């Protein structure tokens, strides 16, 4: 809240701003994301056979339900991209075209999933995630090998432009000097490329 007179509570942000439609973009993470960009951050397994409990929504459901644009950031591993999430914490397109409308959620909705292998976005017609860009040195086959469903490929897939040296300096020296999120040099094992 730039130049805010007061710092809002989570309740004020979610209830007064988000649910009134005053926030355009939400950013979330999760343990699983499926073909239709549904996000699971609640449990691994089935409700009657839970293998692992996770933190839960923490406001992510509100963002996925009310923001017209959602950005999901996660590592790209096959177990994180199943055909269907074990549990839907935050709705993407639920069961495909028309799923959001049937559930009473906003129709105008776009999801972008950014991983260490690719950038995926929902196809406007099928609502399924499709590969939009790949990270430098990563192939479409490598992305598909680490995905539990077969994502389509958008026309004209290109590599993500590497960050400029000044952008890296700002990220590493000003935003994350303790290297909580960024490592000095992040590289992928060659088996994942």
Model-predicted regions and their roles:
Residues 155-193:
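A conserved C-terminal secondary-structure "cap"
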């Amino acid at each position: 809240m730039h130049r805010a007179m007061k710092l809002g509570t989570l309740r004020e942000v979610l209830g007064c701003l988000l649910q009134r439609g005053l926030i355009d973009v939400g950013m979330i993470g999760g343990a699983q994301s499926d073909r239709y960009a549904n996000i699971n951050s609640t449990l691994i397994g089935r409700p009657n056979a839970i293998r692992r409990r996770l933190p839960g929504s923490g406001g992510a459901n509100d963002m996925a339900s009310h923001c017209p644009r959602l950005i999901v950031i996660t590592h790209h591993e096959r177990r994180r991209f199943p055909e269907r999430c074990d549990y839907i914490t935050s709705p993407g397109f639920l069961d495909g075209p028309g799923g959001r409308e049937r559930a009473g959620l906003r129709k105008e909705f776009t999801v972008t999933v950014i991983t260490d292998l690719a950038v995926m976005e929902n196809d406007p017609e099928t609502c399924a995630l499709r590969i939009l860009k790949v990270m430098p040195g990563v192939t479409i086959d490598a992305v598909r090998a680490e995905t539990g469903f077969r994502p389509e490929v958008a026309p004209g897939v290109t590599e993500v432009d590497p960050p400029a040296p000044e952008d890296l300096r700002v990220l590493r020296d000003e935003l994350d000097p303790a290297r909580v999120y960024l490592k000095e040099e992040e590289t992928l094992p060659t088996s994942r490329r």
